[in-house]
């Protein structure tokens, strides 16, 4: 038996767990509706899914089933959608539709849709402009209110209707409006001014008095200028009044290219600058954008700077841009408007290529003369036929006549304007205003009489500002605000530029200070390094250049003392470097000095017998040079020279020990002439007569050998100790700074000026003497002090020079250079 079950939806099957189909409760309530429509519907069958399910305990091969590991598994419990009545499914039918005619459909324009009709777009909507126009612009003041109270009392006595404030304001505003409109029309028209125009007037642009059909001469009804239609770009002459561009805008600008105000002017592309049309035509760099409208004026920026710098020969003003005479070699400059005013010859030539050329001539090269000018010249020359007046004088006369005529027309215009202002009430019709406002004529007449009194009391000035002028004032205020903002931004830009320049200069200054500090730091580090090196070598720091600055004390040593100290320490440095040799070299040197001492003692005995020896030549030569200088200078020696001379007599024995050692390191020069025996004897006599006794006791003599202790040489002998000189040696010498490209040859000798009393002196080669002689002559400029050369010392070979340190020692070269530089800095 087939079980009949009602179909159910998927929700019902999920809730009760039934495996059969069932209809929803709503479907059961409307069974007839379902059967009547016979529309296909769908049901969710869950039995199909249940039949596919197996229990987990069933044993199956892995190939016979699928494992559902997806969380979407719960969706399978809802069943499968199946149609209830598949036979009633509608069939798909397709048919061909004929093409429709192309109809222009409405598309929204790019701009908004504006309603140009007078009717409001919506019922009850009133435009804001209409509301603004309906508001009365005149407000009663205290005087008006007082008069209104008085007139209302009279109206009450007369039995008339009283007047309210709003009606009075409307009537006064209408009076002002009618008066302003009719007065302006009278000023702008010929019949209002009543002035007849001159028939000989010329065009303000081309200066031609002739008019043609289609190119009529048009007059401005406000400024009274006359222009051709083509010259000013008037496409169509209006029937009524016509105003030029400047008068239409109500501005009185100044021309950008000349100093003249007024005239036929057109704006530039920006609209803020104005230029005369004649100036734009005659200046070659300037162009006109539209020749039909003759505006805007373009390419003003193309005018060269030299044209802007020209000085007008007629008005003597350097304003705007001038043109020059068309004659090739003439450079006379003048403004275009000045040339027209002075009557200069200005030609417009049409070429065969339909090009227009403009030719202008200065008063000297111009040939234009008017009959009245020639008549004046003839009368001024007492009947002569020739005219001797200058063109400039004739031009001045024409300008004077033109100015007188302009003054005449201007005075007539002013008189007429004054008369129109006095008769202002004649432009108001009381009857028309009464009908327009629907006010009784008597009331309007009372208000009219009061309005006349108020205007006359206000010097015929209007009681309210005209609407057009008010709008212009507002526009001008807005323009002024924009100009002020532009000026503010310009000033701000300039201030920022100043700040930028200031910061740049401050940064540059700080960088320079930083570089100077770095240089000072390097110099200080170098001085510190030199001081440390001097300290390591044993020099006392109080005698160094860094600590030996010149104080403000008057008893302090002078610059010459510093120079002498630098040279003295340089010589001591050479001695200290030689003292830093190995011990073996010291011992060998002592042995050599001992042998040379014995040799010198033997040679002394031979000198007593009149014999000479080449070995003792350096000693004899050095000692023999002292006496002639002493004989020449006498007792005028300074104190330090006396001490040095006494030291020379006591140190002769020590010098005789050092000389043979120097001869072993350097070959003897046989080119030097031997000294005279008399000088040798005098030199030996100064050394003392007990030299033979010293030779008998070698142990005692060996004790007088120099011993090295640090950087100083200490001599232990029986003679008194000699102090270090504290005063500068006269003519101590100078150091020559080598040039940039000059190279110092290795082994060359550095020379100084001759000094007889200086220790550590040696000989140089003949070639070196010759070169040094030229340098010393150039440095001394022909001056030779007494201490340098005596009467008997005329040969360059008699000069003694400082011996330079060995060039192979880099340390010696470095210290020598530092001492030389420090000596120069001290000087």
UniProtKB/Swiss-Prot annotation:
Alphabetized Pfam families for the sequence: EPL1, PHD_2, zf-HC5HC2H_2
Biased composition (Basic and acidic residues): 646-661, 669-682
Annotated localization: Nucleus; Chromosome; Cytoplasm; Cytoplasm, Cytoskeleton, Cilium basal body
CDD domains, per the entry: ePHD_JADE1 (cd15704), PHD_JADE1 (cd15679)
Ranges for region Disordered: 1-35, 622-705, 769-810
GO terms under cellular component: cell projection; cytoplasm; cytoskeleton; histone acetyltransferase complex; nucleus
Keywords attached to this entry: Activator, Apoptosis, Cell projection, Chromosome, Cytoplasm, Cytoskeleton, Metal-binding, Nucleus, Repeat, Transcription, Transcription regulation, Zinc, Zinc-finger
Gene Ontology biological process terms from the UniProt entry: apoptotic process; regulation of transcription by RNA polymerase II
InterPro entries linked to this entry: Enhancer_polycomb-like_N, EPHD, Histone_Mod_Regulator, Jade-1_PHD, Zinc_finger_PHD-type_CS, Znf_FYVE_PHD, Znf_PHD, Znf_PHD-finger
Polar residues compositional bias, start-end: 16-30, 692-705
ZnF endpoints (PHD-type): 200-250, 310-366
Record comment regarding domains: The 2 PHD-type zinc fingers are required for transcriptional activity.
Described function: Scaffold subunit of some HBO1 complexes, which have a histone H4 acetyltransferase activity. Plays a key role in HBO1 complex by directing KAT7/HBO1 specificity towards histone H4 acetylation (H4K5ac, H4K8ac and H4K12ac), regulating DNA replication initiation, regulating DNA replication initiation.
Quaternary state and interactors: Component of the HBO1 complex composed.
Family that this chain belongs to: Belongs to the JADE family.
Protein name: Protein Jade-1
